[in-house]
Amino acid sequence: MRDTIIIHCSATRAGQDFTAADIDRWHRARGFRSIGYHFVIRLDGTIEPGRDVSLDGAHCTGWNRRSIGICYVGGLDKEGRPADTRTEACLLYTSDAADDGESV
């Protein structure tokens, strides 16, 4: 049973947009079977599916079986330093999913 949502960032610079397909390629290049996250939230707020939610994620050792992994694009400022670059859409989606206890 999945009872936890884990939110990750893509650790990419502010303003650089990437897709779930891009992240899938990065993960495959690192030896994953496919993208490790269940959902990706792009800069414009578009939510793209990643790994099917019926499958365990590959995003947080020890928590993959019981969690949904969400990755938002960003996490670094334009100079490459860590920064909270979450968009309003990202905050709203993750907050609603957690509050409602819905299946994301």
Give, region by region, the residue ranges found by the protein language model:
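Glycine-rich phosphate/pyrophosphate-binding beta-alpha loops
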Residues: 58
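Generic short alpha-helical hydrophobic face used as a protein-protein interaction/packing hotspot
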Residues: 11, 43, 74, 98-99
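Short, conserved "active-site rim" segments that organize catalytic pockets and cofactor/ligand binding
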Residues: 1-55, 64
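Long, well-ordered alpha-helical scaffolding segments within enzyme catalytic domains
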Residues: 16-34, 66-95
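Single conserved hydrophobic/aromatic residue that forms the stacking wall/gate
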Residues: 93-104
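Conserved residues at the C-terminal ends of beta-strands
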Residues: 8, 73, 104
